[in-house]
Amino acid sequence: MTVRLLLASASPRRRELLSQIGVAFEVKPSAFEERMDPALPPEQLVVQNALGKALNVQKRAPAELILGADTVVVFNRRIYGKPTGPADAGRMLGELQGQWHTVYTGIALVEERRWRVAERATRVKLRAMTPAQIAAYVAGGEPLDKAGSYAIQGLGAALVEQIDGCYSNVVGLSLPLLVDLLAEFDRRVF
């Protein structure tokens, strides 16, 4: 049986990951405003945002299986979402370079009155970089729409020195976690 769902995200990375495991989907970007409340633990923040996105789309498609997801980076108890612009991306990378940090991704699946949420954390260490290297990476534009200002699946892979945990989680959607959640809705990838 082919798994089919609505993706409450415009993220090209999440689309690529779903395609990679053979999930059929339709993109229905959510109008939900992501919250970046520093008082919330990151595990709670990402699942709340993921659920908010899925529930927002459910208003337009109440009988569908809907996937919402949210990713943040945490370093020294500070939450890093997407940068506000090139200067912010450079600042984030300057703080993260040479350091271990944690990437949290929350997943929400919603179908009619049922919903399930879960999160996954992955530790990542970026290599040490010179200010010129950071500026060149930012100038290429890749980090401008990524939590933490780097794309592990793109040129940013050259910035990653080590990873401890789920690679696809850092990209923006833990595939092993998603497969487990889909099974709870009687949808099997394999």
UniProtKB/Swiss-Prot annotation:
The protein's required cofactors: a divalent metal cation
Any one GO cellular component localisation term in the record: cytoplasm
Transferase among keywords: no
Enzyme Commission designation: 3.6.1.9
Lineage: Bacteria, Bacillati, Cyanobacteriota, Cyanophyceae, Gloeobacterales
Main subcellular localisation: cytoplasm
A Gene Ontology biological process term: nucleotide metabolic process
Full protein name: dTTP/UTP pyrophosphatase
GO MF, one example: dTTP diphosphatase activity
Active site: D70
Annotated organism of origin: Gloeobacter violaceus (strain ATCC 29082 / PCC 7421)
Localization, UniProt: Cytoplasm
